């Protein structure tokens, strides 16, 4: 593909730094999806009970954000997350997908569909399953003190590409 000469403009180093800074700030500002406090790479909530305009969708994201996970670079259940993104327990991923499918009505339903497609089909970081060898679980909890995790592998092209390029 050839770019026409009239579409190319030389700019100064200062102008380039201005535009680079602007792009970086845009990325920081867009960490959560409009209408939500929890859907995205961060959260904007001041406390656990705060939800955005699309409260049903936001509730799904909030629950998912507080689910069992292994942050990038950390080890849990004998499994080290060497990827760029947080790795989630497969039970959490299943519950998150079902929650998003249950969000219907108005514009909130299509927004939940967008989150679901983006998260699972594009991002698709994969997840882990925990086996509890002793079959002994802590009282009133699903935690397994001697659990061992196995990774399912990336499910979406985006996560696969990012993890390969950064690894």
From Swiss-Prot:
Enzyme type, top EC level: hydrolase
Origin superkingdom: Eukaryota
CDD domains assigned to the protein according to its UniProt record, in alphabetical order: PLA2_bee_venom_like
Keyword match Hydrolase: yes
EC number(s) on file: 3.1.1.4
GO cellular component, one term: extracellular region
GO MF, one annotated term: toxin activity
Binding-site residues, Ca(2+): 38, 40, 42, 65
SUPFAM superfamilies listed in its UniProt record: Phospholipase A2, PLA2
Residue ranges of the propeptide: 136-140
Cited Gene3D superfamilies: Phospholipase A2 domain (1.20.90.10)
Subunit architecture: Heterodimer composed of a large subunit and a small subunit; disulfide-linked.
Protein name: Phospholipase A2 imperatoxin-1
Organism: Pandinus imperator
Species classification: Eukaryota, Metazoa, Ecdysozoa, Arthropoda, Chelicerata
């Amino acid at each position: 593909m050839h770019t026409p000469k009239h579409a190319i403009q030389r700019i100064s180093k200062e102008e380039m730094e201005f535009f680079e800074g602007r792009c970086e700030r845009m990325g920081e500002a867009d960490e959560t999806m409009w209408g939500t406090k929890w859907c995205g790479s961060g959260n904007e909530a001041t406390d656990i009970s705060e939800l955005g305009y699309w409260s049903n969708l936001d509730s799904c994201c909030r629950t998912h954000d507080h689910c069992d996970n292994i942050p990038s670079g950390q080890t849990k259940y004998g499994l080290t997350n060497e990827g760029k993104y947080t790795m989630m327990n497969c039970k959490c991923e299943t519950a998150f997908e079902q929650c998003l499918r249950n969000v219907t009505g108005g514009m909130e339903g299509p927004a939940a569909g967008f989150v679901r497609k983006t998260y699972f089909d594009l991002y698709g970081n994969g997840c882990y399953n925990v086996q509890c060898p002793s079959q002994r679980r802590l009282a009133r909890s699903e935690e397994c003190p001697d659990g061992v995790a196995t990774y399912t592998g990336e499910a979406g092209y985006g996560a696969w590409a990012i993890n390969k390029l950064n690894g």
